């Protein structure tokens, strides 16, 4: 998880309220989110739904917008407090009338109407706090930055498609002090507003890596601890596994399960017993069960 960014060079013009302003332009390292104070001591104000910044931030609801801007949205006082506790700094903090302002350090503090928050988030009853953060830079998400022995357990998920489920998995990884979450293949965007919302702030505390299936197989081949796949026809009940540290827990989606290459690359294949009529549990539930099973076994 990167918490520092590149240096600045030049600027591009933006509009906050009715007053043009200069907004720092980053180098390739990313956007700023760790400065010592607000750039402006007095907050700006935006009420117009046609303000250029509203359009710019609204684009962050789309994957294309996040890729182009390398930024993402996070909302809610609790989530932003978690960001602050993890050492993150926002580019912008947008605050509704009457809401507390200092929930997270930010380069720009902007007072906005509820209508502006509704426009940006697409929600009828938006949270009174909305912040814009730089995504971690590419180097921090490369497997070269992964230190397997820095944690006793890790979570690998193949092709998760539902942002709510993925957000819950990230939250469970945080709750169990997992070293990080490795997303394999065609995964949904962990920085979508829906996923970030589901993490309840854990997005700021958990390392997230994105890899191809071949990269995941290669990682498992050299993994120094136990790698445990989950499957309905697993050869051993999950409670019987020692989860030798550092343990890599590898799960697939409810609909498709794990691909054969990933399953074959793991040292163990565990099953989660289905005792009733249900054939499976969803991704987030399975991840939570296995993460806590590993935590208990490793005590």
Label each PLM-derived region with a short phrase:
Residues 7, 14-124:
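N-terminal positively charged helical leader segments and presequences
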Residues 31, 137-234:
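RNA substrate-binding interface of SAM-dependent RNA methyltransferases
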Residues 72-74, 91-97, 208, 226-231, ...:
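Short, hydrophobic beta-strand segments that form beta-sheet elements in well-ordered domains
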Residues 76, 161-169, 280-286:
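Amphipathic alpha-helical repeat scaffolds
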Residues 112-113, 158, 184-185, 207, ...:
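Short beta->alpha connector loops at strand-helix junctions that form conserved
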Residues 131, 172-176, 187-203, 260-299:
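Structured adenosyl-cofactor binding patch, chiefly the S-adenosyl-L-methionine
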Residues 229-278:
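Active-site/ligand-binding-proximal alpha/beta "capping" segment
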């Amino acid at each position: 998880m990167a918490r520092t960014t590149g240096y600045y060079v030049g600027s591009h013009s933006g509009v906050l309220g009715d007053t043009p302003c200069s907004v720092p332009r980053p180098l390739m390292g990313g956007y700023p989110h760790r400065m010592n104070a607000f750039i402006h001591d007095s907050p700006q104000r935006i009420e117009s739904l046609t303000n250029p910044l509203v359009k710019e931030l609204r684009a962050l609801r789309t994957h294309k917008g996040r890729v182009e801007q390398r930024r993402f949205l996070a909302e809610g006082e609790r989530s932003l407090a978690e960001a602050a506790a993890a050492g993150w700094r926002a580019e912008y903090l947008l605050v509704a009338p009457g809401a507390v302002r200092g929930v997270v350090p930010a380069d720009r503090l902007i007072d906005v109407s509820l209508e502006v928050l509704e426009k940006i988030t697409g929600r009828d009853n938006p949270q009174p706090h909305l912040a814009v953060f730089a995504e971690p830079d590419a180097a921090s998400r490369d497997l070269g930055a992964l230190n397997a022995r820095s944690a006793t357990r890790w979570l690998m998920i193949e092709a998760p498609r539902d942002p709510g489920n993925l957000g819950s998995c990230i939250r469970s990884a945080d709750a169990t002090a997992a070293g990080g979450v490795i997303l394999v293949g065609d995964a949904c965007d962990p920085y979508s507003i829906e996923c970030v919302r589901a993490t309840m702030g854990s997005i700021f505390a958990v390392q997230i890596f994105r890899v191809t299936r071949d990269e995941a197989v290669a990682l498992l081949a050299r993994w120094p601890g136990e790698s445990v796949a989950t499957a309905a026809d697993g050869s051993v009940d999950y409670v019987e596994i020692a989860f030798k540290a550092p343990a890599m827990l590898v799960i697939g989606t409810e609909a498709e399960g794990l691909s054969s290459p990933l399953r074959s690359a793991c040292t163990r294949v565990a099953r989660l017993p289905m005792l009733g009529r249900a054939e499976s549990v969803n991704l987030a539930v399975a991840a939570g069960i296995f993460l806590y099973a590993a935590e208990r076994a490793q005590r």
